[in-house]
Amino acid sequence: MDKRLIAERFARARDTYSHEARVQQQVAEKMLQLLTERASPLFRRIVEFGCGTGSYSRLLLHKLQPESLLLNDLCPEMKECLTDLLPQDTVQFIPGDAEALDFPEKTDLITSCSTLQWFNDPKEFFARWHRFLSEDGY
């Protein structure tokens, strides 16, 4: 899978993505519903990989109110879509390939919506990312 090409295509679509990605918005809303119904209600430290334009990110921030929300996307240009979130002290953006990056240890929740299909080795990703979770993390 050519990650450079994927990033370029998402960069070109970023201005219209939020308006066109209705299914992804529904997935984000359902994901948040499942999290709040079935998981720990307190997630102090959250990492979202593949944040894109931030639809799911905004839901996470509003509903879960974490102490820190670390957003990641393969496409560095997605930062331009997060300008309403980034001035907040609790939110940070790190661009890059989530399969290759290391993130803070003792994270309470590592989450994403509509992203894993772009990964070369999801099994390895989960094995590696497991070490970043807190003892009770998801």
Q: Which positions does each model-derived feature cover?
A:
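A short SAM/SAH-binding and catalytic strip from SAM-dependent methyltransferases
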Residues: 108-122
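A short glycine-rich, Lys/Arg-flanked "PGG" loop and its adjoining helix->strand segment in the class I
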Residues: 123-138
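A generic alpha-to-beta junction signature in SAM-dependent methyltransferases
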Residues: 39, 64, 86, 133-135
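Conserved alpha-helix/loop element of class I SAM-dependent methyltransferases that forms part
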Residues: 22-43
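A short acidic, Gly/Pro-enriched loop at the edge of an enzyme's catalytic core
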Residues: 99-110
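A structural alpha-helix within SAM-dependent methyltransferase catalytic domains
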Residues: 32, 58-61, 126-130
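N-terminal, positively charged/glycine-rich alpha-helical extensions of SAM-dependent methyltransferases
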Residues: 1-15
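Class I SAM-dependent methyltransferase SAM/SAH-binding core
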Residues: 45-101
